[in-house]
Amino acid sequence: METYEILRGLREDRDLTQQEMADFLKIGRTMYRRYETGETEIPIRHLKTLCVFYGVSADYLLGLPDNLSRRSKNARA
Protein backbone atom coordinates (compact mmCIF):
# COMPACT_ATOMS: atom_id res chain seq x y z
CA MET A 1 0.00 0.00 0.00
CA GLU A 2 1.19 3.52 -0.75
CA THR A 3 1.60 6.21 1.91
CA TYR A 4 -1.24 8.29 0.53
CA GLU A 5 -3.62 5.31 0.67
CA ILE A 6 -2.68 4.59 4.28
CA LEU A 7 -3.09 8.26 5.19
CA ARG A 8 -6.57 8.39 3.70
CA GLY A 9 -7.57 5.15 5.40
CA LEU A 10 -6.45 6.40 8.81
CA ARG A 11 -8.44 9.60 8.37
CA GLU A 12 -11.57 7.84 7.13
CA ASP A 13 -11.41 5.24 9.93
CA ARG A 14 -11.72 8.12 12.38
CA ASP A 15 -14.52 9.86 10.45
CA LEU A 16 -12.43 12.99 9.94
CA THR A 17 -12.63 15.31 6.96
CA GLN A 18 -9.74 16.53 4.86
CA GLN A 19 -10.52 20.03 6.13
CA GLU A 20 -10.23 18.92 9.76
CA MET A 21 -6.84 17.35 9.09
CA ALA A 22 -5.68 20.37 7.11
CA ASP A 23 -6.68 22.63 10.00
CA PHE A 24 -4.84 20.36 12.43
CA LEU A 25 -1.66 20.57 10.32
CA LYS A 26 -2.21 24.30 9.72
CA ILE A 27 -2.23 23.90 5.94
CA GLY A 28 -4.84 24.39 3.24
CA ARG A 29 -7.30 21.64 2.36
CA THR A 30 -5.94 21.52 -1.19
CA MET A 31 -2.44 20.77 0.09
CA TYR A 32 -3.77 18.05 2.38
CA ARG A 33 -5.74 16.56 -0.51
CA ARG A 34 -2.50 16.41 -2.48
CA TYR A 35 -0.95 14.36 0.33
CA GLU A 36 -3.86 11.90 0.11
CA THR A 37 -3.69 11.59 -3.67
CA GLY A 38 0.08 11.20 -3.80
CA GLU A 39 0.52 14.41 -5.80
CA THR A 40 2.73 15.92 -3.09
CA GLU A 41 5.11 14.17 -0.70
CA ILE A 42 4.43 14.70 2.98
CA PRO A 43 7.10 16.85 4.66
CA ILE A 44 8.87 15.17 7.56
CA ARG A 45 7.44 17.64 10.09
CA HIS A 46 3.92 16.68 9.02
CA LEU A 47 4.80 12.98 8.88
CA LYS A 48 5.91 13.11 12.52
CA THR A 49 2.78 15.01 13.55
CA LEU A 50 0.52 12.54 11.74
CA CYS A 51 2.27 9.53 13.31
CA VAL A 52 1.74 10.94 16.80
CA PHE A 53 -1.86 11.94 16.04
CA TYR A 54 -2.78 8.49 14.67
CA GLY A 55 -0.58 6.53 17.08
CA VAL A 56 1.31 4.73 14.32
CA SER A 57 4.98 4.41 13.43
CA ALA A 58 6.57 6.21 10.51
CA ASP A 59 7.34 2.78 9.03
CA TYR A 60 3.63 1.97 9.06
CA LEU A 61 2.58 5.28 7.54
CA LEU A 62 5.27 4.96 4.87
CA GLY A 63 4.05 1.45 4.02
CA LEU A 64 7.35 -0.23 4.86
CA PRO A 65 7.16 -3.98 5.44
CA ASP A 66 7.62 -5.19 9.03
CA ASN A 67 10.50 -7.47 8.09
CA LEU A 68 12.43 -4.47 6.69
CA SER A 69 12.21 -2.76 10.07
CA ARG A 70 13.42 -5.89 11.85
CA ARG A 71 16.33 -6.33 9.45
CA SER A 72 17.38 -2.74 10.03
CA LYS A 73 17.35 -3.23 13.82
CA ASN A 74 19.35 -6.46 13.51
CA ALA A 75 21.94 -4.77 11.31
CA ARG A 76 22.57 -2.16 14.01
CA ALA A 77 22.99 -4.77 16.76
Labelled PLM ranges:
Residues 5-24, 49, 75-76:
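Short basic helix-loop element that most often maps to the first helix and adjoining turn
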Residues 45-60:
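DNA major-groove recognition helix of helix-turn-helix/homeodomain DNA-binding modules
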Residues 26-41:
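Recognition helix of helix-turn-helix/homeodomain-like DNA-binding domains
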Residues 7, 21-22, 32-35, 61:
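Conserved hydrophobic/aromatic packing and binding residues within compact polymer-binding modules
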Residues 36, 54, 65:
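DNA major-groove recognition helix of helix-turn-helix
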Residues 1-5, 69-71:
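A detector for short, charged/polar N-terminal pre-domain segments
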Residues 62-77:
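Short, charged recognition helix plus adjacent turn
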